[in-house]
Amino acid sequence: MRARKATVELQYNGAAVKTSLKEFGEAFSYTDPAGGSSDSISLTVGDPRYQWISAWLPHKGDQITAKISFADRDGDDKTTTLDCGLFTLDDLSYSDNGGKAAFKMSGVSAPALDAFSTTERTQNWEKVTLKKVAQTIASRYKLQLVFDATDVAISTQEQSSATDSSFLNQLCNDYGLMLKVFRSKIVIFDREKYKKKDPVATIPREEMSSFSWNTTLAGSYTGGTITYTDPKTKKDVTYTTGGGKRLLKSSTKADNLADAKRKIEAAVTSANHGITTISFQTMGRPDLCAGQTIMVTGVGRLSGKFYIDKKTDSLTSTSYTSKIEASQVPTTSDAVIVDAIQRLAAIGVINSPGYWIGKHKSVKYLDDLLLQMATTILVNHDTGLYTGNPQEALDALVKYGVINTRDYWAANMGKLQYISDLICKAANALPEIIQ
């Protein structure tokens, strides 16, 4: 759905606000992050009769319930309502420039009880699970817990002079889970699981009024190493996942090897999220929300599947727009693999793209190999160092982080004609400095 107009419905401390953006409002925005922070709203209202600094003066801690009603742009008069939730005012400001007075209110979707985010606690959690910890904390503030992830057993975990909000958020981060507080709920979910879901919509470039894209290697990793002290033997234990030169190093508490393995894999995955990002603005999209995936098309090689990290709906008396901030999701869908093959052909790593388009499903993991090659190899340096030498070519690809499973490809190059040639050409494309 693409909305052509929208109106805001507000309840202030339980009472309906009998105003509209057209009468008083200048702007309203609703920000929906996927996790790591709470939903938020911002409302700017004109104050020509100075009511907002007298009888209507809001106070920090007051509560606002916000809903946005949308009319479909197709003109069928169908109305959809988006319940933004309950917000606690935490920031108020007022300005008066030459008689043009305005009052701005901002609020977050967090428990009204300040203790959740301000009161520090010290507690030793023993023989619990992450879900049990979250349920205990949620109950303190009369919040509902929504837990959509594989639970984690925790032998001991110290909460040392930390607020319940920061402690629970850090605990989720340690295990690669996302936390979000909204609509009187604490929601914990597995972002990697959500990234695997089917796209809910396709957004072509023609529907975007603006578009930006960024990618970087800074902060990305091909693996990680964790060192922890075994609680039973008191000896240091080191575990490494992945390979290559860009290893994330961690020294942290772990209950056992399985716990350490999950923590370092979560840390690497979290660090690699957001390596490639996009941001675009479109006509209001009430059907989209953070945590969903979308397909973006019409931007050449930048097209693909993306996970919505944040969505901001902005309304004025005359317009409604949505800003989407999203991270690319590596995928092996046909469209993305065809695009990867064409990119490799464009730089001379592949000579016959039609062959690979027809064969990319014939060998297990070939999709992933082609996608990783296209993502990593952007320029063909054509060193010629590995022509006719696929085994050394595999070593070079491992060093550069193009592949992690050398043994698999060493054993399976003969399953399809020209795989060894592809591996050699890909290695030749790497800059000589890393050889």
Residue ranges and their predicted role:
Residues I41-T44, G107, E120-V146, Q159-F182, ...:
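Amphipathic, non-transmembrane alpha-helical segments in extracytoplasmic/periplasmic proteins
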Residues D83-S93, S303-S314:
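Short beta-strand-centered aromatic/proline hotspots
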Residues K100-F116, T318-A335:
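Short solvent-exposed strand/turn elements
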Residues D32-L43, A260-T276:
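Short, basic/aromatic beta-hairpin or loop at an interaction surface
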Residues V336-Q435:
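Short, solvent-exposed alpha-helical surface patches in non-cytosolic proteins
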Residues M1-A112:
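Assembly/oligomerization scaffold segments
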Residues R2-E9, A15, N169, M178-S270, ...:
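Acidic, small/polar-enriched beta strand-loop surface segments
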Residues D77-T80, K100-P111, Q144-S212, L217:
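Short beta-strand-centered interaction patches in the first periplasmic/extracellular domains
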